[in-house]
Amino acid sequence: MRSRNQGGESASDGHISCPKPSIIGNAGEKSLSEDAKKKKKSNRKEDDVMASGTVKRHLKTSGECERKTKKSLELSKEDLIQLLSIMEGELQAREDVIHMLKTEKTKPEVLEAHYGSAEPEKVLRVLHRDAILAQEKSIGEDVYEKPISELDRLEEKQKETYRRMLEQLLLAEKCHRRTVYELENEKHKHTDYMNKSDDFTNLLEQERERLKKLLEQEKAYQARKEKENAKRLNKLRDELVKLKSFALMLVDERQMHIEQLGLQSQKVQDLTQKLREEEEKLKAITSKSKEDRQKLLKLEVDFEHKASRFSQEHEEMNAKLANQESHNRQLRLKLVGLTQRIEELEETNKNLQKAEEELQELRDKIAKGECGNSSLMAEVENLRKRVLEMEGKDEEITKTESQCRELRKKLQEEEHHSKELRLEVEKLQKRMSELEKLEEAFSKSKSECTQLHLNLEKEKNLTKDLLNELEVVKSRVKELECSESRLEKAELSLKDDLTKLKSFTVMLVDERKNMMEKIKQEERKVDGLNKNFKVEQGKVMDVTEKLIEESKKLLKLKSEMEEKVYNLTRERDELIGKLKSEEEKSSELSCSVDLLKKRLDGIEEVEREITRGRSRKGSELTCPEDNKIKELTLEIERLKKRLQQLEVVEGDLMKTEDEYDQLEQKFRTEQDKANFLSQQLEEIKHQIAKNKAIEKGEVVSQEAELRHRFRLEEAKSRDLKAEVQALKEKIHELMNKEDQLSQLQVDYSVLQQRFMEEENKNKNMGQEVLNLTKELELSKRYSRALRPSVNGRRMVDVPVTSTGVQTDAVSGEAAEEETPAVFIRKSFQEENHIMSNLRQVGLKKPVERSSVLDRYPPAANELTMRKSWIPWMRKRENGPSITQEKGPRTNSSPGHPGEVVLSPKQGQPLHIRVTPDHENSTATLEITSPTSEEFFSSTTVIPTLGNQKPRITIIPSPNVMPQKQKSGDTTLGPERAMSPVTITTFSREKTPESGRGAFADRPTSPIQIMTVSTSAAPAEIAVSPESQEMPMGRTILKVTPEKQTVPTPVRKYNSNANIITTEDNKIHIHLGSQFKRSPGTSGEGVSPVITVRPVNVTAEKEVSTGTVLRSPRNHLSSRPGASKVTSTITITPVTTSSARGTQSVSGQDGSSQRPTPTRIPMSKGMKAGKPVVAAPGAGNLTKFEPRAETQSMKIELKKSAASSTTSLGGGKG
C-alpha cells in the first residue's frame, strides 16, 4: 500500500530529474488531492453500491490511460509526469475509500475501548477514521488498562499505608500511656517531696525554737558570768589604779625631794662661789684703785708737760712743712725747665745721629772713589764742625742730668721726713683720746667701788643665812638617802617586771605572727571556696535553666496530649451515641421477633385445636381437613423459613451496621491518610527537587543536618538525664559546701575580731612598756639630779593633759538594701543561712568591753531578731541619729580669739587661747602650761622627758546614768550603756578601705582611740516596758594629778573626725558637721559659737542626747539636720557648782544581721514594718529623724583636790 508521502517523494524525484515541469506536476497534484478530499466527503454519505461504482469508474479511466500509454510509447517526459500524477491521485482516492470502509466496519466495543464511551456512534466513527488517516495505523490501545493497573497499585499501597498507620497509632498509644504514667509518677514524687520539705521545715522550726531557748539560757548564763567578771575586773582595776597612783605618788614625791635637794645644793654652791669670787674681786679692786690713783696723778703731770711740748713741736713742724713745700715748688719748676731742655737735646741728638750716618756713607763712597767732589768735601767738613759742637753740648746735658738726680733724691728725703712727722702727730692725738677715756673709767670705777662695798655687806649677811640653811639641808639629805635606798629596791622590782613584760611582748608578737599566717591561710581557703562556690553556682544556674526548658517542653507535651485525649474522648462519646442508637434498633428488632414468636405460638395452639377437632369430627371431614392441614403446615413451614430469613437478615443488618461504622472510620482514616500522603507527596516532590539541585551542586542537603541534629538532640537528652542525676548530687554537695562556707565565714569573722583584740592588747602593752621605760629613765635621771649639770640646774617640762568632748549633730538616713529574691537560690540556701546565723550568734565573742549593754543588748531587741530571719524582709536600717536640745549660751565675742585664764591653784594661772576659724568651721584651743617651779608648787608632777611637747586631745566618750522615765516618753526603744569620758591618746594608722567593720560611704578619720584612765564600773541597766534607762553625759576637760598609764581599748569613733590632735600645744576642734550641708541648712545659716564662761558663774542646765550608731557590715549615709546648727565651747572654772542633767532619749542599740531566706510566708503586719536586728558584739543600728537644733561642748578644768562632783554633758556615745 502506498502512502501520500511516497507520492511526494516520487514527485520530488521527478522534480530533481526535470525541474521545469515540476510546477505543473505540483499544481496537478494539489488539484487532485483537493478533488480526492471532495470525493471523500461526498462518498461518506453514500452507500456501498455508490462506492463500488466509483471504483469501477476509476478502473475504467485507468484502463484507458494504459491503453493510451501502450499506443503512444513515444510520449514526452511532461506527459509522463502528468500521467503519473493522475495515477497517484487515483491510488490515493482508492486508499481513502478503503479507509472509509474500514471505519464503517469497526465495532462499537472497539470505539468504547478507545474513547471510553459508545453513545455518539457516528461521531466516534468519524474520529476513529480521521485518527487512522492521520496516523495511518490501527489504534488498538485500551483506555481502561492503565487506570485499572493504577487502581490495583493504589489498593496495594493503601493497604500498606493502612498497616503502617495502625502501627504508628499503636506506638503513639503506648507512648501516651507511658507519658501519662510518668506524669502520675512525677506528681506522686512532687507530692512526696513537698511533704518531706514541709516535714523538714517543721523540724527546722522546732530546731529553731529549741535553739532560741538554748540561746536565751546561754545569754542569761553569759550575762551572769559577765556581770561577775565585770565586778571582778572593776575591783582589780580599782586596786590597780590605787597601786599605780600610790607608786606614782611615791615616784613624784621622790622626784620632788630630789629636785628640791638639787636646787638647794645648787643654790648653796652658787652662793658660796659668788661670795669667794666677790671677796677676791674686792681685794683686787681696792689695791688697783690705790695704784690707779697714784698713776693718775703722775699721768696728769706728764700729760701737761707732753701737751705743751707737743704743741711747740707741732708749730715748728708746721713751719718746716711750709718751707719744704715752697722749696719743693721751686724744685718742681726747675725740673719742668730741665725736662724741656732734655727733650730739645734729644731731638738734636737724633739729628746728629742722622748726620753721622750720612758722613759714614760719604766716607765709604770717598774710600771707594766714587765721588771726588770738592763740594761734598766741604759739606763733610761742615758736618764735622757741627758734630764737635754737639759733643760739647752733650757734656752740658750730662751735667744737668746729674743735678736733676740729686734734686730728686733730696725731694724724696723731704717727703719721707714729712710722713714721719704726720704719723707722730696722729699718735699724739690717739694718746690724748686714750687719756680722756682713762679719766672717764677712773670716775666709773670710783662709783663701782662704793657699790661693791655695799654689796659686800649684803653678801656677808646672806652667807650667814645660807650657813643656817646648809645645816637644815644636810639633815634632809640624810633622809633622802634612806628614801633612795628604798627606791633602788623598787627600781630592781620594776626592772624584773620589765623583763617579764618584754618576754610577754615577744610571745605576743610571735602569737600575732602565727595568727596573721593562719588568717592569711584561712583567707586563701575562703577565696578558693568562694571561687568554687561561684563556679558551682554558675553550673547550678545552667542546669536550672535547662530544667526550666525541659519543664516548658513537658508543658507543651502535656497540652498536646490533653488535646489528643480530648479528641479521643469526643470520638468515644460519638461512638457511645452510635452504640446507643444501634442498641435501640436491636431492641426494636427483638420486640418484633418476640411478636413473631407469639404469633407462632398462637398458630401452634390453633393447629392443636384443629387436630383435636379432627379427632372429634371423625372421618366425615377427613379429606378437606387433610388438605387444610397440609396447607396450614405449608404455611407454618413458610413462616418458619420467613422467621429464619428475618433472623438472618437481622444478623446481616447488625453486621452491616458494624461494617458501616467500621467503613465510616476507615473512610475517615483513609481521608486523613490521603491528606497525609498528599502532604508527603508534596514533601517528596520538594525533596526530589532538592536532590536534583544537590546533584547539580546548587543546594546543600538537609537530611544530613537533620540526622546530625537528631543525634545531637539524643546525646543532649542523655547528657541531660545524666546531668539531672548529677545535679541532685551536686545540690547536696553544694548544700554541704555552703554550710562549710558559712562556718568558715563565721570562724573568719571571729578570728578577725580576736586578731583586732590581740592587736589592741599588743598596742596597749607596747604603750605600757614605753611608759614604764620612760618612767625608769626619768627616775634614773632624777636620781642624778643632785649633781649639777652644765646649766647649773635641771628643769622639768611638765605637760598638761586634759580630756573633753565636742558634740556634733550628725544624722543619717538608714541605708536600705533590697536584693532580688531568686527562687532557686532561696530553695538551695534557706536552711544553710538559718543554721549559719544561729552558729554565728553562738560563736561570736564580745569585742568591746566598754559597757555591759554593748555585749548583751536588752530583751526588747529580740523582738526584732525574731522578725529578721524572714527572707522577704531584706530591708535593713542602719544609720546614726542624734537628738539634741539647745545648750546654754553666754554672751561673748566668737569672732575674735579670746584668752581665758583658769587657775588650777591660786597664784599659778593656766592660759587657754581659743582661736575660731569661721571659714573652715574649726576652732584652735591653745593651752600654755606654767613653769616647772610654779607647777611643782601647785600640783603633783607627771614625769615626762624634758624635751617632750604636751599632746592634748579632746574626744567624745559616753557615760551612763540610769534614770527612770515615764512610759509615755520612752518611744524610741531601749538605751545602751555609755562609758565615761576618759583621757585618751591617739595612734594614727591607715583605715582599711574594705572590711567588715569599715564604713565605706562616709569620711573616716585615721585615728585609733586608746584610753588612758578608767572610771567607776557602769551601772547595771534593767530595761522594762514601764521604765527605760536613759544615758546622760557631760564632757569635762580635766587636769588630774594621777598618772594614768594603763590604756584599755575603746571602740573606734569613725563617725566624725572633728578633732585633730597636734604636737604644738594646740587643740583643733571642728565646730559643726564635717559633711556637706544641704541647701536648706546653708540657707538658714550655720554659725559656730564659742562660749567662754567667767570665773564665778554657776553652770546652767544642759540637755543633749546622742548615740553612736554603727553597723560593721552596712554602709552609713549621713544626712545633716535641716534646722539651725550652732557649736559652742563652754569653759568653766573649778568654783562652778555641779550641773544637773535632765533625762533624754537615746536610740536603740542593735546591729544589722544578714537576713536569711525561707519559704515561710510572712504576715502583712510584718511586711509593713522594717525590722532591726540586734546581735551581741556587733554595732548599733537605729533610724530616727534628727531633732538637734544646737550642738554644745563643755570644757571644764578641775583641780586634783576638787570635791567628787558628777558633771555630765551632751555628746556622742
From Swiss-Prot:
<dbReference type="GO" id="GO:0022038">
    <property type="term" value="P:corpus callosum development"/>
</dbReference>
<feature type="modified residue" description="Phosphoserine">
    <location>
        <position position="138"/>
    </location>
</feature>
<feature type="coiled-coil region">
    <location>
        <begin position="192"/>
        <end position="591"/>
    </location>
</feature>
<keyword id="KW-0597">Phosphoprotein</keyword>
<feature type="modified residue" description="Phosphoserine">
    <location>
        <position position="979"/>
    </location>
</feature>
<comment type="function">
    <text>By acting through a filamin-A/F-actin axis, it controls the start of neocortical cell migration from the ventricular zone. May be able to induce the degradation of filamin-A.</text>
</comment>
<keyword id="KW-0963">Cytoplasm</keyword>
<feature type="region of interest" description="Disordered">
    <location>
        <begin position="1"/>
        <end position="70"/>
    </location>
</feature>
<dbReference type="Pfam" id="PF09727">
    <property type="entry name" value="CortBP2"/>
</dbReference>
<feature type="region of interest" description="Disordered">
    <location>
        <begin position="878"/>
        <end position="900"/>
    </location>
</feature>
<feature type="region of interest" description="Disordered">
    <location>
        <begin position="949"/>
        <end position="976"/>
    </location>
</feature>
<feature type="compositionally biased region" description="Polar residues">
    <location>
        <begin position="880"/>
        <end position="894"/>
    </location>
</feature>
<dbReference type="GO" id="GO:0098978">
    <property type="term" value="C:glutamatergic synapse"/>
</dbReference>
<comment type="similarity">
    <text>Belongs to the FILIP1 family.</text>
</comment>
<protein>
    <recommendedName>
        <fullName>Filamin-A-interacting protein 1</fullName>
    </recommendedName>
</protein>
<dbReference type="GO" id="GO:0021987">
    <property type="term" value="P:cerebral cortex development"/>
</dbReference>
<feature type="compositionally biased region" description="Low complexity">
    <location>
        <begin position="1125"/>
        <end position="1138"/>
    </location>
</feature>
<keyword id="KW-0175">Coiled coil</keyword>
<dbReference type="GO" id="GO:0005886">
    <property type="term" value="C:plasma membrane"/>
</dbReference>
<keyword id="KW-0206">Cytoskeleton</keyword>
<dbReference type="GO" id="GO:0005829">
    <property type="term" value="C:cytosol"/>
</dbReference>
<dbReference type="GO" id="GO:0015629">
    <property type="term" value="C:actin cytoskeleton"/>
</dbReference>
<dbReference type="InterPro" id="IPR050719">
    <property type="entry name" value="Cortactin-Actin_Reg"/>
</dbReference>
<dbReference type="GO" id="GO:0001764">
    <property type="term" value="P:neuron migration"/>
</dbReference>
<dbReference type="GO" id="GO:1903119">
    <property type="term" value="P:protein localization to actin cytoskeleton"/>
</dbReference>
<feature type="compositionally biased region" description="Polar residues">
    <location>
        <begin position="1139"/>
        <end position="1156"/>
    </location>
</feature>
<feature type="compositionally biased region" description="Basic and acidic residues">
    <location>
        <begin position="61"/>
        <end position="70"/>
    </location>
</feature>
<feature type="region of interest" description="Disordered">
    <location>
        <begin position="1103"/>
        <end position="1213"/>
    </location>
</feature>
<comment type="subunit">
    <text>Interacts with FLNA. Interacts with RHOD (in GTP-bound form).</text>
</comment>
<keyword id="KW-0225">Disease variant</keyword>
<dbReference type="InterPro" id="IPR019131">
    <property type="entry name" value="Cortactin-binding_p2_N"/>
</dbReference>
<dbReference type="GO" id="GO:0005730">
    <property type="term" value="C:nucleolus"/>
</dbReference>
<dbReference type="GO" id="GO:0099010">
    <property type="term" value="P:modification of postsynaptic structure"/>
</dbReference>
<feature type="coiled-coil region">
    <location>
        <begin position="624"/>
        <end position="781"/>
    </location>
</feature>
<feature type="compositionally biased region" description="Polar residues">
    <location>
        <begin position="960"/>
        <end position="970"/>
    </location>
</feature>
<feature type="compositionally biased region" description="Low complexity">
    <location>
        <begin position="1168"/>
        <end position="1179"/>
    </location>
</feature>
